[in-house]
Amino acid sequence: MIEKSFDTPCGAIRYWINDAPVNDAPCLVFLPGLTADHRLFERQIEYFEDVCRVVVWDAPGHGASWPFEFDFDLMDKARWLDALLAREGVEAPVIVGQSMGGYVGQAYAQLFADKLRGFVAIDSAPLQRQYVSAAEIWLLKRMEPVYRYWPWRWLLRSGTNGVATTEYGRRLMREIMMSYDGNKARYARLSGQGMWMLARAIEADLPYEIRCPALLICGERDRAGSCVRYNRAWHKKTGIPLEWIRDAGHNANTDRPEAVNRLIGDFMDALPPAKPRG
């Protein structure tokens, strides 16, 4: 994987891309969740980098995409992603978003529906207003002070054991979390701003319709918020296929990478040919 940088008015986004294999396979774009970085998808990158073109980023303010001004919203992230992909010549991406990455994918679908070839949500939830209560939105807007108040050791424990069920998944997330060790203020700001962005995107009450082939993946033991409930409702309302990952938590792709990789691979194989652009 080749590390690159994409400049925005708020800072530089770091991302990684492989030397694209010469085939007709779609480009997989991996978007990690809130506070996680590109390492969240290391097992997916290992599996797919010799199969197709692969892109993964450290989201704005995350990992190597720092320093970064917190003066952007979810739609800005989607626009930056589109510009980044355009620079790399990616015209019909398949977005694979975990948690917050899935929200970015839905924002991308709202803005660039004609470009999106496929969408896979891993332990994410729908952005449509109908799924979320007013109380939930109110809380999302006020989470930064909560993160500032909680002791770091508690945040570290909940951010590792609370999102993964396996030794590998927890160890990986702990390594990622430790990049914020000694700078809890950055972690609180990053987390709070992410929740605020999410609330604002939901309040916008946009269609966020997924018009391309899509797949929902969720860990059976996901305890992050109401993710399990949201996925059931999302599947029931839209008919988007939903696959449950046995014994997996919120980071299902780290707890059961072989199962998630198989589902993504099968999803890719079933995609119709990309429509010619012109």
Residue ranges of predicted features:
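Catalytic active-site module of serine/aspartate enzymes centered on a nucleophile-bearing elbow/loop
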Residues: 238-278
